[in-house]
Amino acid sequence: MPYPRKRFGQHWLKDPAVHEAIVRAAQLPPPQRDPAWVLEIGPGTGQLTQRLLAQGVHVVAVEIDRDLCRLLQKRFADQPRFHLVEGDFLRLPLPPQPRLLVANIPYNLTGPILEKVLGSPAQPVRQFERIVLMVQKELAERLQAGPGSKAYGALSVRVRYLAECELICRVPPSAFRPPPQVESAVVRLTPRPAPTPARDPRWFSQLVCQGFSARRKQLVNALGGLVDRQTVAAALAQLRLSPTARAEELDLPDWLALSDLLLEQTPRMAAVSGEGKPR
């Protein structure tokens, strides 16, 4: 078995119990005449791939490591439901067939990969029914966090706009070879088929990111770069939110309502808004 390469952020998941938990979390349909298609990002040596194929599905595996591609081609040479794509997932178009996605991904690429498979509030990706990812534990906490939590931030709100997130299991460093320096977790994202839309998703995104950019400040001050204090204060009062509210105290419906109300009152600002980045 090849040794994991640091430049690709590789850590082989060696715990079979975690492999099985990932397969169960994907909720694969039973074998049928027209098998389901699963996208696997970074199959590595094919341990998870083998378990997926055993469920009777097609697996489209995207692998950037040329040596691993040769290993995978040899390992699954007699498996007609295995489809290998060599290349950088972030530079390739999404293969059209898969409606399910599983991945044990490099943690430094989690943000860009999430954006590619979920999209953004302004441009949601509607391809996948379920997405099961191995991520750093701290990120899993951010994805799951709700109002009032220290982990709750712009990413929490933006992902919640697009999908429901569930924690499947925590994974210790000892489950990998070599062990990473952080704890991990498996999460399942279920994209919303029709998210409750903000009237202007770009404005919504920018407002959320601006609010959390100064999370210790009250919103009347934190949103000052976009909207004047008096307008924010009036909107909070109209929505029956505390005049001293901070970004971390608002849940998704609150942010949607505030975004739409401020859009009515500051149309010129919204018209020139660009989509913010998660923090």
Swiss-Prot record:
It is an enzyme of class 2 (transferase). It catalyses: adenosine(1518)/adenosine(1519) in 16S rRNA + 4 S-adenosyl-L-methionine = N(6)-dimethyladenosine(1518)/N(6)-dimethyladenosine(1519) in 16S rRNA + 4 S-adenosyl-L-homocysteine + 4 H(+). It comes from the Bacteria. Its main location: cytoplasm. Keywords: Cytoplasm, Methyltransferase, RNA-binding, rRNA processing, S-adenosyl-L-methionine, Transferase. S-adenosyl-L-methionine binds at H11, L13, G42, E63, D88, N104. GO terms for cellular component: cytosol. It is found in: Cytoplasm. The keyword Methyltransferase applies. SUPFAM superfamilies: S-adenosyl-L-methionine-dependent methyltransferases. Transmembrane segments: none annotated. Its EC number is 2.1.1.182. The keyword Transferase applies. GO terms for molecular function: 16S rRNA (adenine(1518)-N(6)/adenine(1519)-N(6))-dimethyltransferase activity; RNA binding. Specifically dimethylates two adjacent adenosines (A1518 and A1519) in the loop of a conserved hairpin near the 3'-end of 16S rRNA in the 30S particle. May play a critical role in biogenesis of 30S subunits. Belongs to the class I-like SAM-binding methyltransferase superfamily. rRNA adenine N(6)-methyltransferase family. RsmA subfamily. This is Ribosomal RNA small subunit methyltransferase A. The gene is rsmA.
